Amino acid sequence: MEVRTFAFLQIVVFVALGIQLFAAVTDAADADDEFFTVDYCGMNCTLQQDGSWTPCTQKNAECKCYHESGSSVGLCLSTAYTDFNQFGDPNNSDLDAATPRHPDASSR
């Protein structure tokens, strides 16, 4: 009796794991339309005595100071988020219609 109960519980756990894995893979497949990048700017930032942080001066002010709460040292990071859903389908016929044509191509 105990063996059957244990086997049943193992099957339940494997089924639950399979469902979770399927959900994770499906969610990851949908994430192709979004792209988030973080780049280290090559410098750190520190908390000054007046409560302000030293500026991150790399990459034309694209870098910002990111720090954990309670910490007096942070990292200068550059972040970028791209949502590829904002761009149209590259196979859209409107793109072909809007493509510039060479002036001689219309006379042929």
UniProtKB/Swiss-Prot annotation:
GO CC terms, sorted: extracellular region
This protein's UniProt keywords: Disulfide bond, Glycoprotein, Secreted, Signal
Annotated S-S bridges: C41-C63, C45-C65, C56-C76
Localisation per UniProt entry: Secreted
Record field: compositional bias (Basic and acidic residues): 99-108
Spans annotated as Disordered: 88-108
Predominant location: secreted
Organism superkingdom: Eukaryota
Record flagged with keyword Secreted: yes
UniProt GO molecular function: C-X-C chemokine binding
Record's signal peptide: 1-31
Glycosylation sites per record: N44, N91
Biological role: Salivary chemokine-binding protein which binds to host chemokines CXCL1 and CXCL8.
Name under which the protein is recorded: Evasin P1229
